[in-house]
């Protein structure tokens, strides 16, 4: 079937607009973030070097691979999370029975092996390795390191939280999170994935993702707040960052994510932070399921994919629920106020209407 010339012209204009937006706005955002990352990592590496001197079990895994840092996540242009991978999970079993949405526990495989664990003093009487106890010890060490390190005049611990958070030069926030890497494992709470009726991702990619596994993070879990407090302290938060990044390879998926993050930072950085970059990434993964064929991720389709994601976002905000991609029982809007979600819904709808009705909208956005 021949495509009318006017449709080709509209499509060409949109591709030009998208490419120009990437060259201008997206690249400017990336350049600024790259510069900030260099500064952040210099400070954090120095702090972690001091921590390691005091406690050799906390070895920094923040290494520079040609400008990329393993375990560093950009939350926003001024907020970052750095994962510190801990050693030796050996004598502990991973237990995911579904009672803690988005979380799991690490339990001694045999009570007699308690003394064999590298983390023996953080194991509870019931045999669980307590995420909160490890984080509390790490927090104390980081606070001491901040006072001793070379950047002590520009880095401060953020108080009133059980998280390990630093403020650098008053404007940048960095959370440092202890974690275990769980390679070759796949949690029961994500066992439904991939959905059998959807031909995406390719079985080879699924196999790679499941072999690579996931991470268990020592951080507060909003889903558990107000529940059994003892279990809440012992539980580890499941994270699938590597899996998500692998799934978004190919076609224009990564470019879509960069555009979505840029639009989010410029227009949806709202009170209460209802729309995070992670929510954009999650909705992009759902869009990949809705459009499983590679031809649907050609640059000609990029405008349609981005509009589809914004329409999904409006629907989620109106329903006040955004399920985690791998753990659908976990709601990413948990803890957000209805007012913040309502306000975000109106703002996203305004933005989406502009994008659907004005082919040159990216010049102003």
UniProtKB/Swiss-Prot annotation:
Disulfide bridges in this chain: none
GO cellular component, one term: nucleus
Pfam families per UniProt: Mab-21, Mab-21_C
Keyword Protein biosynthesis applies: no
Cell compartment(s), UniProt: Nucleus
InterPro entries: Mab-21-like_nuc_Trfase, Mab-21_HhH/H2TH-like, MAB21L/cGLR
Gene3D superfamilies: 1.10.1410.40, 3.30.460.90
Record keywords: Nucleus
Keyword set includes Nucleus: yes
Family statement: Belongs to the mab-21 family.
Protein name per its UniProtKB record: Protein mab-21
